[in-house]
Amino acid sequence: ALAVENRRIALEKEQATVHAQNEQLRANLLRTISHDLRTPLTSISGNASNLLSNAETLDAETRTKICTDIFDDAQWLIGLVENLLSITRIEDGRMNLQISPQLMDEVVEETLRHISRKSKEHIITTTYSDEILLADMDARLIMQVIINLVDNAIKYTQKGSRINISAYAKNSNIVVDVSDDGPGIPEQNKAQVFEMFFTGQNQIADSHRSLGLGLALCRTILAAHKGTLTLRDNEPHGCIFSFELPKSEVSIHE
């Protein structure tokens, strides 16, 4: 009877700990969202008000600049909402993965067509090995992983810097590396970059776009695929985010 009671107490303590962690996560999320969303929303509202009030007096170049700013802020907000929904659904077990064999090089190319216009300020290249890069995945979610990794590289590197996406086979996995030649990540921050809400100190990054959900989401999505996400240095400077997915056992000819 004592052993049963001890197990009951231990289970209650564990449940209380999980509940406290969930409440802390919810509090962090609400606090961070309410703080960090204010700037882009204020920017959208201010720019839209300017257009409504001064449309007839603004020259074409100024109107285009204002519309571009509104578009960029709106796109960032859309991406944020998609990340939040994906994290919530996966961690609640409500995300039904639509797994099928996909060619990784085709997924990468499709992803690049969805990358925001900011990618035009960087040099993005791709490298694929000669073998068939077939992996089992939910292509929509893996595209979201690649978008987040590339957006992260864009955010933390100078305009005009290089970002390379390479895909290749390694043993029983398909590997994708997203590398940049930026300043890299300090050693003391490497263990934290995958934590939700963590944002590194970087003068290049846009300070109001710093929820720190992207890498946490990437790792969550890849864990649901039985895959991994790692970080290493890109010599002489920069970093490489690398993820692996199991190879598909389906033949490309089937």
Regions found by a protein language model. Give the residues of each.
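Short alpha-helical segment of the dimerization/phosphotransfer core of two-component systems
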Residues: 72-77
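Conserved catalytic submotifs in the C-terminal HATPase_c
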Residues: 98-103, 125-133
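Short helix-loop "hinge" at the ATP-lid/N-box region of the Bergerat-fold HATPase_c
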Residues: 153-154
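Short beta-strand/loop element within the Bergerat-fold HATPase_c
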Residues: 160-172
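Short conserved segment of the HATPase_c
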Residues: 185-199
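Short alpha-helical Gxxx[C/S/T] motif in the catalytic ATP-binding
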Residues: 214, 218
